[in-house]
């Protein structure tokens, strides 16, 4: 089955600060920065070679764990196109 990488989605306590760090450390470009309907800040970044990295915060009233099976900080998911 053919597939290609689409994006990575990270969850952060401070999506803006995290995105700024990636800009400084790895020359990412911030494509958009908005608050979604669910109340979470969503920052879309692009690497110098075109990979997309999305960074978002907790949704309204969402309880975030450190690394459990529920919603948690860090890697939320990575997306593949099939």
How does the language model describe each region?
Residues 1-3, 59:
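General secondary-structure edge motif
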Residues 2, 10-53:
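Core segments of cupin and vicinal oxygen chelate
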Residues 4-13, 41-46, 66-82:
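Vicinal oxygen chelate
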Residues 55-57:
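Generic preference for hydrophobic
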Residues 60-65:
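A short local loop/turn or secondary-structure capping micro-motif enriched for an aromatic residue
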């Amino acid at each position: 089955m053919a597939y290609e990488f689409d994006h990575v989605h990270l969850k952060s306590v401070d999506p803006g600060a995290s995105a700024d760090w990636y800009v400084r450390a790895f020359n990412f470009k911030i494509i958009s920065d908005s608050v979604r309907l669910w109340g979470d800040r969503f920052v879309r970044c692009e690497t110098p070679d075109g990979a997309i990295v999305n960074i978002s915060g907790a949704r309204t009233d969402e309880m975030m764990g450190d690394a459990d099976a529920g919603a948690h900080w860090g890697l939320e998911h990575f997306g593949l196109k099939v």
